[in-house]
A protein has these predicted regions:
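Sec/Tat signal peptide C-region and signal peptidase I cleavage site
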Residues: 20-27
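Bacterial N-terminal signal peptides that target proteins for export
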Residues: 1-11
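Short acidic-glycine-tyrosine-enriched beta hairpin
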Residues: 39-44, 54-56, 86-103
Length: 138
């Protein structure tokens, strides 16, 4: 195996890992991979970031993240209504953030506005071997 083959395989694996968080999101929003990198001083952990763009009134399906994944979510623009586990629904405005514990169920994630788009940055810290970071709730 030469270095180019190894590099291609690594790039393919990283692209897959970045794209997987989009699995639970519906057609009305766009999930764009932003960043993925192993955390050098925490062996076995990686940092993955995605940007979720919500059209006016758009919502994600209820979903759960990998059991190892800590999620920090930051509202870049607009307003996002969110409910994690059995907690209350809350509207977060641009500049506000929230946190999801590993294995939590994200019951509601939607654009709170019917007229203005919204954007969310989601940052995952998870086990490097967890390739499926988001799973829809059926």
């Amino acid at each position: 195996m030469n270095i180019q083959t190894i590099a291609r395989a690594a790039c393919t694996a990283m692209a897959f890992a970045i794209a997987v968080p989009a699995a639970a999101h519906g057609a009305a929003e766009t999930v764009t991979p932003n960043f993925q990198h192993a955390i050098p001083n925490i062996p076995g952990k990686s940092l993955t970031a995605v940007v979720v763009d919500y059209a006016p009134g758009a919502a994600s399906s209820a979903h759960r993240h990998a059991g190892s994944a800590f999620i920090y979510a930051y509202v870049v623009s607009g307003e996002i209504e969110s409910q994690v586990d059995d907690g209350p629904k809350r509207v977060y405005h641009a500049g506000e953030s929230f946190f999801e514990e590993p294995g939590a169920v994200h019951r509601t994630s939607r654009n709170a506005s019917e007229t203005t788009p919204a954007k969310l940055l989601a940052v995952f810290v998870a086990d490097t071997n967890d390739k499926v970071l988001t799973t829809p709730i059926k």
